[in-house]
Amino acid sequence: MLLHFSPAKPLISPPNLRRNSPTFLISPPRSLRIRAIDAAQIFDYETQLKSEYRKSSALKIAVLGFGNFGQFLSKTLIRHGHDLITHSRSDYSDAANSIGARFFDNPHDLCEQHPDVVLLCTSILSTESVLRSFPFQRLRRSTLFVDVLSVKEFPKALFIKYLPKEFDILCTHPMFGPESGKHSWSGLPFVYDKVRIGDAASRQERCEKFLRIFENEGCKMVEMSCEKHDYYAAGSQFVTHTMGRVLEKYGVESSPINTKGYETLLDLVENTSSDSFELFYGLFMYNPNALEQLERLDMAFESVKKELFGRLHQQYRKQMFGGEVQSPKKTEQKLLNDGGVVPMNDISSSSSSSSSSS
């Protein structure tokens, strides 16, 4: 508590009491006069403590690849109070400054900042070249490396190949993007695999602190191995992107009489067409299960075509010859009764029955 003193006017008694005024009514010395009390208020103290705690618990995160997806994630990371530094092949200094991040055009300068976490937001195709040329020796040996690629076995293998053994590895996949997650991340899947996290309590806590960012945003947190992720993703994400691009090539357009199902198709095209073909190619090239899914899609499409044309062929035969359209088995039996050509399976069955009777 601070005491401020200032001169004060002497206390003047009424005229009839001035002579007999007691000594205790005399004004205090000017040097001891209290003018104001400057004390910190409770809410100011709590705000200060909260600010200091937030700074102490903040992570310094280096984002490699500050393109569309990197900027999308960075806005949320900064909103959670973390310190962001970025690097990319292109100059994104203006974009970084606009959200409160710092941009470094040289990866050596970025590593000199000693980030707690290095977050790879590069494309699938450029990931290996980025890791191969990255100056790991300038980082602390306990640095946590995180990727957000749409395939998981591929970056896991690259991390193990190129990263020093002292570094921690966390493979993640936020299964949403700037379009599907532009309003909220609530309920959207976030898949992660703690590939290599040190036993030290500080390293365990750092990993959990990073994951809590997405948990606090309401993401559906799914811990899953990289191998299992790629198996499921080939049947969901790759198929989704494939159908979206097929419908885009087909040219679906909105109409005045859209059904709910058709609106879903339009949304699918919108969500997938905004992603680069490089991403789609990466989903195909670097997921070992993607080719099988593409072949299954092709077989399913051919099966539907055959079913449609088969039904059309039956209707055509009915119009041409009249009467009930017979199934293939009934047709074979009719040919037998009419003395037509006998199928080979019927010949073999009849011969076997005759031999048994003899």
From Swiss-Prot:
GO terms for biological process: tyrosine biosynthetic process. Pathway: Amino-acid biosynthesis; L-tyrosine biosynthesis; L-tyrosine from L-arogenate (NADP(+) route): step 1/1. It is found in: Plastid, Chloroplast. Its main location: plastid. Residues 348-358 have a biased composition (Low complexity). Signal peptide: none annotated. It is an enzyme of class 1 (oxidoreductase). Keywords: Amino-acid biosynthesis, Aromatic amino acid biosynthesis, Chloroplast, NADP, Oxidoreductase, Plastid, Transit peptide, Tyrosine biosynthesis. It comes from the Eukaryota. It catalyses: L-arogenate + NADP(+) = L-tyrosine + CO2 + NADPH. Belongs to the prephenate/arogenate dehydrogenase family. Unlike TYRAAT1, TYRAAT2 is composed of a single catalytically active domain. Involved in the biosynthesis of tyrosine. Has a weak prephenate dehydrogenase activity. This is Arogenate dehydrogenase 2, chloroplastic. It comes from Arabidopsis thaliana.
